[in-house]
UniProtKB/Swiss-Prot annotation:
An annotated GO cellular component: cytosolic large ribosomal subunit
Keywords noted in UniProt: Ribonucleoprotein, Ribosomal protein
Location of region: Disordered: 1-26
Keyword Glycosyltransferase tagged: no
Similarity-based family: Belongs to the bacterial ribosomal protein bL27 family.
Protein name stated in the entry: Large ribosomal subunit protein bL27
Organism, scientific name: Nitratidesulfovibrio vulgaris (strain DSM 19637 / Miyazaki F) (Desulfovibrio vulgaris)
Alphabetized NCBIfam families for the sequence: L27
Listed SUPFAM superfamilies: Ribosomal L27 protein-like
Pfam families referenced in this protein's UniProt entry, alphabetically: Ribosomal_L27
Single Gene Ontology MF annotation: structural constituent of ribosome
GO biological process, any: translation
Keyword RNA-binding: no
Length: 89
Protein backbone atom coordinates (compact mmCIF):
# COMPACT_ATOMS: atom_id res chain seq x y z
CA UNK A 1 0.00 0.00 0.00
CA UNK A 2 1.08 3.53 -0.64
CA UNK A 3 2.48 5.46 2.28
CA UNK A 4 1.42 8.81 0.82
CA UNK A 5 -1.86 9.88 -0.69
CA UNK A 6 -1.60 10.69 -4.41
CA UNK A 7 -1.25 14.42 -5.08
CA UNK A 8 -3.67 16.05 -7.48
CA UNK A 9 -2.42 17.45 -10.76
CA UNK A 10 -2.87 21.12 -11.48
CA UNK A 11 -4.69 22.26 -14.61
CA UNK A 12 -2.75 25.52 -14.71
CA UNK A 13 0.89 26.03 -15.60
CA UNK A 14 0.71 27.32 -19.18
CA UNK A 15 1.37 30.76 -20.59
CA UNK A 16 1.96 32.03 -24.09
CA UNK A 17 4.51 34.61 -25.18
CA UNK A 18 3.27 38.15 -25.79
CA UNK A 19 2.66 39.23 -29.38
CA UNK A 20 4.69 42.46 -29.24
CA UNK A 21 1.87 44.73 -30.29
CA UNK A 22 1.74 48.47 -29.61
CA UNK A 23 3.20 51.76 -30.76
CA UNK A 24 6.69 51.31 -32.23
CA UNK A 25 7.39 54.94 -33.22
CA UNK A 26 6.08 57.82 -31.14
CA UNK A 27 5.14 61.38 -32.14
CA UNK A 28 8.10 63.55 -33.14
CA UNK A 29 10.34 60.60 -34.07
CA UNK A 30 12.05 60.53 -37.47
CA UNK A 31 11.20 57.53 -39.64
CA UNK A 32 12.26 56.05 -42.96
CA UNK A 33 9.87 54.69 -45.58
CA UNK A 34 8.82 51.19 -44.53
CA UNK A 35 9.34 51.71 -40.79
CA UNK A 36 6.58 50.16 -38.68
CA UNK A 37 4.67 52.74 -36.63
CA UNK A 38 2.00 50.65 -34.85
CA UNK A 39 1.25 46.94 -34.53
CA UNK A 40 -2.37 46.40 -33.52
CA UNK A 41 -5.45 44.18 -33.58
CA UNK A 42 -8.03 46.05 -35.68
CA UNK A 43 -7.87 49.78 -36.34
CA UNK A 44 -7.26 51.26 -32.90
CA UNK A 45 -5.12 53.82 -34.75
CA UNK A 46 -6.12 54.81 -38.28
CA UNK A 47 -3.68 55.56 -41.13
CA UNK A 48 -3.33 59.20 -42.15
CA UNK A 49 -1.14 61.00 -44.69
CA UNK A 50 1.88 59.01 -45.92
CA UNK A 51 0.95 55.97 -43.82
CA UNK A 52 0.04 52.55 -45.21
CA UNK A 53 -1.81 49.68 -43.56
CA UNK A 54 -0.89 46.00 -43.89
CA UNK A 55 -3.45 43.19 -43.93
CA UNK A 56 -2.86 42.55 -40.22
CA UNK A 57 -3.61 46.27 -39.52
CA UNK A 58 0.08 47.14 -39.07
CA UNK A 59 0.69 50.83 -39.84
CA UNK A 60 3.89 51.76 -41.65
CA UNK A 61 5.50 54.90 -43.09
CA UNK A 62 5.43 55.30 -46.88
CA UNK A 63 7.84 58.27 -46.94
CA UNK A 64 10.75 59.54 -44.86
CA UNK A 65 9.73 62.14 -42.30
CA UNK A 66 8.43 62.83 -38.80
CA UNK A 67 5.62 60.95 -37.04
CA UNK A 68 2.57 62.92 -35.91
CA UNK A 69 -0.44 61.54 -34.01
CA UNK A 70 -3.77 63.37 -33.85
CA UNK A 71 -7.15 62.78 -32.24
CA UNK A 72 -10.08 63.55 -34.49
CA UNK A 73 -13.84 63.36 -34.04
CA UNK A 74 -15.76 61.22 -36.48
CA UNK A 75 -19.53 61.23 -35.92
CA UNK A 76 -19.77 60.67 -32.14
CA UNK A 77 -16.47 58.85 -31.77
CA UNK A 78 -12.98 60.20 -31.09
CA UNK A 79 -10.39 58.30 -33.12
CA UNK A 80 -6.62 58.48 -33.36
CA UNK A 81 -4.89 58.96 -36.69
CA UNK A 82 -1.16 58.84 -37.43
CA UNK A 83 0.57 60.84 -40.17
CA UNK A 84 4.13 61.10 -41.42
CA UNK A 85 5.10 64.69 -42.20
CA UNK A 86 7.59 64.44 -45.10
CA UNK A 87 11.17 65.59 -44.52
CA UNK A 88 12.20 68.78 -46.34
CA UNK A 89 14.46 67.96 -49.30
Amino acid sequence: MAHKKAGGSSRNGRDSAGQRRGVKRFGGERVLAGNILVRQLGTRVHPGDNVGMGRDYTLFATVEGTVKYEKYTRKKKVQTRVHVVPAQA
